[in-house]
């Protein structure tokens, strides 16, 4: 920056210096790390409605920080074995080893899924999945990921696939979650290996010259952050000096002074669940469920244990299905966290789909520790099962509430951006060598605008390359009132079957024509002129552009073609912005 500023004198020097100082003052004090202009900030807060009708708004910029425990240990061990499906098909499957195997379960130490991910039973080298995760977690307002290296593996095969995706979007200006690690077993050796493989790797640095900008830095030191045992005699001095090391904190161990918790048992929802001094990087954990009673989620799933499931609240597990679907346990913890107002919240977790089958416990022939089935699991990633994207959307909204994020657009905002190169093909193998292919990417949406001229709204959408025609082509979805009315919250759709045709929701995937908008199509841009009266004379709305989606399937906004923004989230427009 100094070299750049040196070429300016007089007026220009003063202007640029003032801008730089303002930028640092506003955004840099808490992080104490290099900053890049983040495109996602230009989009303001996103909003949407989940399957339960709950309204969601994403966070704006804040000094508060949110980290996410991120798991990359899913490599193919056969199957796929899906515990929820196995027991649903044969309730006696957990009676014995023989019954388990006969019902389609896997042997000891094999990975078993607690349920089916929305993206399929993927493995940790599927770059298509990482591309989705990068968008979802950036949109959610997650500030940093913590890779689970607690079992002394550093997952170089997985990160060799993930890092290029993260780096691509970081360089493009997106404020992607920064990266860090959590060690426990053989902590010193593991931290040494992590340092050598990622932080002090000349070959990696040559491939990604700005890689240092991707490492999460703890606020009180500005050093790259890692969780581990700084007193481990195996830890090399240069590694100890390089990192800001916070102590690995297990939920069933005594509280460490500088601990970093990944879950709480006895300290759950008490003042003892805060680690560190407020204003100095204090941190609390929130998780989808806790295996506090038996330390075996399978015990509560199948054998009468009383671990805190997803449906736990008010000191008991609630049998009401809405407690499970609505994340009662998750909600209760977030409510408590906001009362104590720490600087950092660490969420457990995301993409923790698998657990290894463990040796039998007396009276419990089939044992899993961290996750067992839909109820007794803690993942916030969207599921192909009954949870759908409820927990992801809830996480987005809870992050916004914790950060006291913006509920409305920034003044003058009428330009919106989407991630480029998010229509890449998928041709991968998952667990059990299951093939996963997706070639639905067609038009890569990049930039959108909205403005009002007199009695009409003018919307544009641009794509990276010339527009390609086809079914379910470049459709505009509008939520006119911010509620769950219409189809999945969308009250109007434009261009669903005929370019320019405005239709109003008649319930489910049924639509009634309202009129024709003027439409201009040229090369890589579409312009719509929609009379405001066709949209009920609204002064603001939420909207999404989607191409090559699956009609009537809201989850195809995650999985098919291109949706801007992704999933159920929408951009927000208000005349007050102009």
Residue ranges and their predicted role:
Residues 455-465, 526-531:
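Short, well-ordered beta-strand segments enriched in hydrophobic/aromatic residues
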Residues 469-478:
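Beta-strand acidic-aromatic groove motif in beta-rich domains, primarily in extracellular
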Residues 446-450, 514-519:
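Beta-strand-rich interaction surfaces with strong enrichment in secreted/lumenal proteins
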Residues 2-18:
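N-terminal Sec-pathway targeting helices
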Residues 33-416, 513, 530, 536-538, ...:
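Glycan-processing catalytic domains of CAZymes
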Residues 409-418, 477-497, 523, 533-578:
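Acidic/polar low-complexity flexible segments
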Residues 430-456:
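Low-complexity, acidic Ser/Thr/Pro/Gly-rich terminal tails and inter-domain linkers that flank the onset
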């Amino acid at each position: 920056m100094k070299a750049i500023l040196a070429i300016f004198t007089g007026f220009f020097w003063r202007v640029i210096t003032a801008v730089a100082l303002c930028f640092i003052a506003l955004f840099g004090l808490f992080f104490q790390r290099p900053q890049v202009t983040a495109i996602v900030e230009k989009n303001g807060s996103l909003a949407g409605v989940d399957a339960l009708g709950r309204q969601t708004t994403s966070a704006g910029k804040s000094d508060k920080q949110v980290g996410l425990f991120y798991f990359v240990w899913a490599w193919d061990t056969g199957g796929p074995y899906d515990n929820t499906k196995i027991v649903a098909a044969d309730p006696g499957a957990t009676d014995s080893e023989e019954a388990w195997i006969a019902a389609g379960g896997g042997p000891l130490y094999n990975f078993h899924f607690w349920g089916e991910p929305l993206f399929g039973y993927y493995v940790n080298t599927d770059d298509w999945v990482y591309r989705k995760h990068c968008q979802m977690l950036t949109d959610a307002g997650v500030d940093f990921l913590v890779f689970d290296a607690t079992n002394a593996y550093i997952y170089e095969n997985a990160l060799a696939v993930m890092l290029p995706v993260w780096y691509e979007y970081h360089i493009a200006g997106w404020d992607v979650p920064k990266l860090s690690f959590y060690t426990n077993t053989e902590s010193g050796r593991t931290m040494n290996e992590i340092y050598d493989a990622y932080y002090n790797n000349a070959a990696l640095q040559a491939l990604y010259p700005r890689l240092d900008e991707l490492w999460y830095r703890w606020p009180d030191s500005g050093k790259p952050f890692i969780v581990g045992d700084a007193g481990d005699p195996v830890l090399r001095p240069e590694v100890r000096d390089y990192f800001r090391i916070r102590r690995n904190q297990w939920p069933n161990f005594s509280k460490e002074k500088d601990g970093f918790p990944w879950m709480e048992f006895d300290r759950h929802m008490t003042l003892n669940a805060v680690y560190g001094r407020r204003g100095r990087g204090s941190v609390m954990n929130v998780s989808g469920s806790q295996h506090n009673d038996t330390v075996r989620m399978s015990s509560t799933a199948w054998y009468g244990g009383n671990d805190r499931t997803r449906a736990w609240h008010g000191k008991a597990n609630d049998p009401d299905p809405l407690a499970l679907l609505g994340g009662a346990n998750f909600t209760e913890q977030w409510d408590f966290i906001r009362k104590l107002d720490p600087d950092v919240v660490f969420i457990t977790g995301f993409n923790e789909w698998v657990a290894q089958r463990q040796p039998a416990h007396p009276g419990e022939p089939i044992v899993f520790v961290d996750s067992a089935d839909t109820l007794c699991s803690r993942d916030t990633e969207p599921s192909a099962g009954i949870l759908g994207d409820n927990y992801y959307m809830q996480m987005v909204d809870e992050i916004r509430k914790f950060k006291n994020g913006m509920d409305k657009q920034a003044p003058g905002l009428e330009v919106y951006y989407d991630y480029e190169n998010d229509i890449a093909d998928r041709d991968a193998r998952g667990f059990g060598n299951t093939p996963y292919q997706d070639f639905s990417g067609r038009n890569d949406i990049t930039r959108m605008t909205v403005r009002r001229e007199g009695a009409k709204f003018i919307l544009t959408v641009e794509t990276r390359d010339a527009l390609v025609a086809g079914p379910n082509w470049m459709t505009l979805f509008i939520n006119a009132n911010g509620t769950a009315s219409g189809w999945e919250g969308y009250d109007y759709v434009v261009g669903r079957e005929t370019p320019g045709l405005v239709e109003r929701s008649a319930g489910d995937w049924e639509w009634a024509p309202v009129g024709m908008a003027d439409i201009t199509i040229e090369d890589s841009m579409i312009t719509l002129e929609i009379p405001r009266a066709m949209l009920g004379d609204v002064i603001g709305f939420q909207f999404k552009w989607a191409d090559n989606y699956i009609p009537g399937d809201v989850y195809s906004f995650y999985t098919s073609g291109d949706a801007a923004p992704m999933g159920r989230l929408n951009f927000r427009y208000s005349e007050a912005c102009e």
